[in-house]
Design a protein with these regions (language model features):
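Extracytoplasmic/periplasmic mature domains of Sec-exported, cell-envelope-associated bacterial proteins
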Residues: 1-290
Length: 290
């Protein structure tokens, strides 16, 4: 979605492998999930890429990233899945004139939330927390929206963000082996909704949270009548797992809920006060995505 936001004058054009191009029209976008759908005008006979299953990915599995980094069309880089379910706070892609750095985090959609790094200067656009696939396949500005592909040629993620250390003098440093992709299963659900109605929904827990020590996400407030309240959760409770996924901090809980299907059932592992951890089944709500 941040690629559309960065389009100069709102003019969108798709360029295909054979060198032909066509104007494209926006079908819809979900800026929080950083997903957009566009439709190429007057084009037929295209062969779509096969979709993989991001739920079956394993750490260490080989993958390749495809895109147009720094304007170099058709670039393919290889690597592995470095981590799964990585909470990543992203922000829209800066224009070339804004990609001057001073150290810190920058990216395809700037990226925040990694200890010791600060956000690089860029145009302010909505931020979101992704439940991302981390890869060391080289990804650079211009890779946004390009596929992360497994060894069977199936797309398993959409490249969305990188961590990059600014060069300090002018210009932006390239890949340092920390790239992040949106899992394709999540992207497909959102894309299907955008195609059907032009709008997408997202799961809602109905809480505000903060980091808990030594780990977990503490509920600061619980909204009456929403999913968490209906499940009996209370302010002060600490969530340490969503299903089998560990929650290390507040971003981890936000990312896990953002990646869940609206209306789905999840099991939270919760600690209340000095009590022992216990599980709480929750039926997530559904709200329109931004």
């Amino acid at each position: 979605a941040h690629v559309l936001a960065a389009a100069q004058g709102g003019q969108l054009t798709a360029t295909f492998q054979n060198g032909s191009s066509a104007p494209v029209q926006e079908v819809g976008q979900d800026t929080q999930a950083d997903i957009a759908v566009v439709r190429a005008q007057g084009v037929s006979g295209l062969t779509p890429i096969q979709l993989g299953n991001s739920d079956t990915l394993q750490v260490g599995q080989p993958v390749v990233a495809v895109g147009t980094p720094l304007g170099l069309a058709g670039t393919v880089t290889s690597g592995i899945v470095s981590a799964l379910n990585r909470p990543v706070e992203t922000q829209g892609e800066p224009s070339p004139s804004q990609q001057q750095g001073q150290g810190g985090l920058s990216g395809l959609g700037g990226l925040g939330g990694l200890s010791g790094l600060s956000a690089a200067p860029q145009q302010q656009t909505p931020t979101s927390v992704l439940d991302a696939i981390q890869t060391d396949a080289a990804i650079n500005p211009g890779n946004s929206g390009g596929p992360l592909v497994d060894m069977q040629g199936r797309i398993v993620g959409l490249n969305s963000a990188i961590a990059s250390l600014g060069s300090g003098g002018g210009g932006q440093s390239g890949s340092i082996g920390l790239g992040f992709s949106i899992p394709i299963n999540q992207a497909k659900r959102i894309a299907d909704e955008l195609i059907a109605s032009g709008h997408a929904t997202q799961a809602q827990l109905g809480v505000s949270v903060r980091d808990s020590q030594p780990n977990g996400a503490q509920l600061v407030s619980v909204a009456p009548g929403l999913a968490a309240a209906k499940a009996g959760l209370q302010a002060g409770d600490v969530v340490t797992k969503v299903g089998s996924q560990l929650v290390e901090n507040s971003d981890g809980l936000v990312a896990a809920i953002n990646s869940a299907d609206p209306g789905s059932n999840v099991t939270l592992t919760v600690t209340s006060g000095a009590g022992a951890p216990h599980t709480v089944p929750v039926t997530l709500g559904s709200v329109p995505a931004s």
